[in-house]
Amino acid sequence: MAGHTVVQRALPNIASGSFAQSASKTSSHTSKTSYSAVVTPPSSDGNPNVWRANHLPDGLIYIIVGGTAAAIFAFIILWYAVARYMSRRVAKKTMYETNIQWRDTPSSGLYDHGDEKELYQSLVDHSDKNDARPKKSLIGLLGGGNGLGSSTSYDTVADADMDDDLIGGGYQERFNPVQDFVPSHFPRSSLFISPTLEVAQQNQQSKSVGRTNHFQNLSVTSLPSASESSSNLLDRPERTASPERKPKAYGRYHQRNRSSVGVSDHSHSRSHSRSKSASSFEMPNVNNNNKKHGTTPSRFLNNLLEGNDDGTT
């Protein structure tokens, strides 16, 4: 080991050689320099092609669109509120006028709906225009033979118009939709017969007839003609018992009980005449019966005491 020698070589230094000099030269030549570009917009002064928006706020377009939508929405709400208020006001006014007309019209409760009201109103207008009563029907519906629409003594009185004014125009002829006159201007294309119209007229005429009878009893009464009496007899319904029998039994009951309560003057006169006739015819019958059956025991004893031996008077 002692005889061997070690030879060491040093590595070449890069920085100290020619290679280091060449590297420094290339790095100095590859460096670059950067510059920033500055753009200046043209001024709007004296230039008509540039919009002058320096004094306007940002987002002006969005503000305009939002304001337009809000205005349309507010207009719709305002229109709905005004229309609702006007409709409610018109409805209240119409209801008030309808109530006033219903209170002023006395016969508005009879015909409230449907074609019956229009038919009745057209007939009333036509009768007022021509100043004549409608033609009386030959047949009446729902018991037309009760004599409500028949002629009475009221039609023959000379001052009937004055009584009609006092009554209030309650006299009305019955209307038959089948035979009575219907105005041509009323569009009626069916053969429908309304029973409610007949019933309402029947009730109204019964009330009016009751009022007219009161005035007829106070005023002049006249006898009906032969035709009227025959028609009344035909229209009169059949009776189960004769009314002439009832006053006789009623008078006999009070006469038997010796009571004058509830007996009219006519019944008193009839009962008085019957009592006279009965007394005049009953006395001979009693004498005849006594003769037939003989004298009574009390009468026979009286005759014996008086001296009559045969026991006869």
Curated annotation (Swiss-Prot):
The similarity annotation says: Belongs to the PRM5 family.
- Region annotation Disordered: where it falls in the sequence: 22-48, 221-313
- This chain's protein is named Vacuolar membrane protein ZYRO0A01628g
Q: Does the keyword Repeat apply?
A: no
Spell out the InterPro entries in the cross-references.
PRM
The UniProt record lists the keyword Ribosomal protein? no
Quote the biased-composition stretches of kind Basic and acidic residues, using this chain's numbering: 235-247
Q: Locations of Basic residues compositional bias?
A: 248-257
Q: Where's it found, cell-wise?
A: Vacuole membrane
Which stretches are tagged as biased composition: Low complexity?
22-37, 221-234
